[in-house]
Each structure stands twice: as C-alpha cells, then as structure tokens.
UniProtKB/Swiss-Prot annotation:
Lineage: Bacteria, Pseudomonadati, Pseudomonadota, Gammaproteobacteria, Lysobacterales
HAMAP family: GTP_cyclohydrol_B (MF_01527_B)
The gene coding this protein: folE2
Site features described as May be catalytically important, chain residue numbers: C155
Family the entry assigns: Belongs to the GTP cyclohydrolase IV family.
Keyword Hydrolase found: yes
Organism: Xylella fastidiosa (strain M12)
Descriptive protein name: GTP cyclohydrolase FolE2
Biological-process GO terms, alphabetical: tetrahydrofolate biosynthetic process
Catalyses which reaction(s): GTP + H2O = 7,8-dihydroneopterin 3'-triphosphate + formate + H(+)
Superkingdom of origin organism: Bacteria
Annotated EC: 3.5.4.16
MF GO annotations: GTP cyclohydrolase I activity
Function of the molecule: Converts GTP to 7,8-dihydroneopterin triphosphate.
Cited Gene3D superfamilies: Urate Oxidase
Length: 298
C-alpha cells in the first residue's frame, strides 16, 4: 500500500492550458476585529480570497494555503496596514503558480448603538452592512470601503399634491367664512391635516470610498456620520412618540427624489473623500419597482 498522498493540483496538467484572472474561495466564515474610536468590536463576517493563476501549465492553486493565511490574519484588527501584509503573503505563497496579484473581500455588519432623536435616556442598535475590498496588483494595493446607510425619503411631488388637496379641502369647507381665528384653523388642521398624505419609503444609500494603504483604521463612524448628516433622515432604532414626531419633522424638511439624495451625497462626500461611488435606491411605496441613481468621483 502506498503511503504517499496524491496531489493532483501539483502533479497533473490541465486539460486546457489557459491563464485565469482570479481563483480562490468565497463565503469563508471569519471573525472580524474592528478598531473603532469608541472601542473595539468583534463581529462575524464572510470573506472571499483570490489570487491570479497566470501559469497555464498549473492545474490548480493551493486553496488551503490561502485559508490558513486568512485564518492567521483574523486574530488581528482589520486595517489597511495589516491587510497589505496578508495580500503580499498570499502572492508569495503561490510562487509555484507564478501568481502576481491577490484580493480579499470582507462582508459583515457593523453594529452601532444610536441615541433617539429627542429622548435623552433612550438608544438602540443599528446594523450597517459593510463590504471591504483590498486588491494587490503590480506592486500597488487598492482599498475600497463600502457601507449601506438606511434612511427615509418623502416624495416632493406627492407632498405638493397632498398640500394642494388639503388647501382645496379647507377652502371648500370654509368658502362662506370671511374670517377664522387661529384656534379654529388649528382645530381644523388637527382633524383634517391628514386628508391627503405624501408617500414615503425606506431608502438605501450604498457608499464606497477609497482608503489609503497607510490608514490605521477603516473610518466607519466618520463615513456613516457623514452620510447620515447629509441625508438628514436616517432610520431610527428605539423611539418614543416625541422621537417619532421629530422624525416626521425631519422628513417634511427634507423631501427627496432619488436624484436629490444622490446629488446631496455627491456634493457632501466630495468635501471629505477624494474618490467615492454612490448608489441610491428608493424602495417605492407608490410603485412595485424601485427608483435608483448612482454617481462617482474617482
């Protein structure tokens, strides 16, 4: 009985000799350590790890090598500085495949405790989907950090139509009245103010920004704060009625088409980030389809 274990990837030749741009694994379960200014955080994520395979005569890469490198790196905080070492090690581990490029993607939810809009003693958890890509090629590393921010959008056209209907209803009911006290008008509005209401919906902004190789942290809080400040209507966690009322006021003061939200983000992000991409989606309540828009400054 033979004691040697066959290694097909090493000893066999491919049926078709051709280089491959990327080869690796996807959906790898990994722990993710985040370095955040207000304290570290450990979350569960998934990763994709790949290298190029330019050697046409090599049947397959050594995926276990990539897995072990990723596993070893998982004990460290996820930072651009540390990731550079991981990518270099991935390429070096496949010198026998003539590999020159590597990339890793991480997917996870960043958890953040957020205060209520008005209630000082109330807060709750928000989860932000995050995607981080790092790619090494030709001696250069590129980093893209992507986060998805949820917010509320109220249609400007629908709001105008609702206001018109409310005004028409008021005039029709008081056509023969020459003067009304403020209290009477206020009472009428309390009873009839929702005669027609504009449609609004939960909306999503996916924001990608470029990071530098020298960055010692991802900068998630700064990016999320920037986006939510620009949009002004981020979805809430725990609320009381007073917070819900404040949220309604914010929505009324920030009527947005999908184009408006995208342009807001484009203008606001350009002040803080040299390269970014924005993808916005309004999950329409009027239509069975979504409204979408995107822009980039690279």
């Amino acid at each position: 009985m033979s004691t040697s274990i066959p290694d097909v990837a090493v000893h066999d030749s491919p049926a078709i000799a051709a280089p491959l741009r990327w080869v690796g694994m996807d959906g790898i379960v990994v722990p993710v350590q985040l370095t955040i200014a207000d304290g570290g955080q450990h979350v569960i994520g998934r990763a994709r790890a790949q290298i190029d395979l330019p050697a046409m005569e090599v049947k397959g890469i050594h995926m276990s090598r990539l897995y072990r490198l990723l596993d070893t790196h998982a004990v460290e905080p996820l930072t651009p500085v540390g990731i550079c070492g991981l990518l270099s090690a991935m390429v070096n581990s496949h010198a026998d495949c003539a590999s020159t490029a590597a990339r890793v993607d991480w997917y996870f939810d960043w958890l953040r405790r957020v205060p209520a809009l008005v209630s000082n003693d109330l807060s709750g958890w928000r989860g932000y989907p995050v995607w981080l890509r790092a790619e090494y090629s030709a001696g250069h590393v590129q980093f893209w950090l992507c986060v998805e921010v949820g917010y509320s959008s109220t249609c400007p056209c629908s709001a105008a139509l609702a206001r018109q209907m409310l005004a028409d209803a008021f005039l029709q009911e008081h056509v023969e009245v020459s003067a009304l006290s403020p209290e009477t008008v206020a009472d009428w509005l309390r009873s009839n103010g929702s005669y027609a209401t504009p449609h609004s919906q939960r909306s999503l902004a996916r924001i990608e920004v470029a990071l530098t190789e020298q960055a010692v942290e991802l900068g998630l809080p700064a990016l999320v704060d920037c986006a939510e400040r620009i949009l002004s209507t981020p979805v809430q966690a725990a609320v009381r009625r007073v917070d819900e009322q404040a949220f309604a006021r914010l929505n009324g003061a920030n009527l947005m088409y999908v184009e408006d939200a995208t342009r807001r983000l484009q203008h606001g992000l350009a002040i803080h980030y040299s390269a970014f991409r924005v993808h916005v989606r309004h999950l329409e309540s009027l239509h069975p389809h979504d409204a979408v828009a995107s822009t980039a400054d690279e």
